[in-house]
Amino acid sequence: MEDAVYQEFLELEQEHWWFRGRRTIFVSLLDRHFGRDPGGKRLLMDLGCGVGGMLEQLGEYGQVIGTDVTLKGLEHCAARDFERLVACNGPAGCFGDESLDCISAFDALEHIPDDVGTLREIHRMLKPGGLLIASGPAYQFLYAQQDRIVHHVRRYTLGDFAAKARSVGFEIEKATYINFILFPLILPIVLLLKIVQKISKPDDTKAGSNVGIGIPRIVNETLAGVFGGEAKLLRAFSAPAGHSLVMVARKPGPTR
């Protein structure tokens, strides 16, 4: 990501509706598929931890290590007193075989050219019975300036996302689109912005992310409630469409 976006995310992630909503969904999925164990011995890795937006929550499930390809994000994590941090250019060689109980990749795989190779490395590092929880942006036809600013290589369909995980040996426990309630509102806005940007040709290096657009507090709170409220609905079904997606997958074998 551009350096300015790291700073922007640091300032927004605690209060902005998008960050809050997705955290609620991710925590709900981890509660159901992994279970809390604060202070326990289970070892988790957050791949592409950025400025540490999920490290505190992941600490409720065991000992968490944050990894990122850039020092900029890890510097922000260290400033927030997160201590277990590793700089590595992708997961290859970062950890030994079958050494981790859970790996999270929240909006990380879409940044990596060889996402299947990364999934293969994740599978290698997980213990038998270990869990992968991964999220990403949905639908390539929505690829726009925002994706370029944060250095996305691609966007996914849910079928493609899950198929890539299966191809390296994972069993899928849950795969769903998220941000599906607001998607009918988001979709025309994104498509309109794509048209405007195609005409105006803005400079990506000087633009901030679209999450930095200021909105009234009451609107932010409402949107956070709507997005986060999807967590309860997703206990009963998987959404057929949405602006993002999330997958919970397990490496076959008895949990150690």
Q: Where is each model-derived feature located?
A:
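A short His-aromatic
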Residues: 111
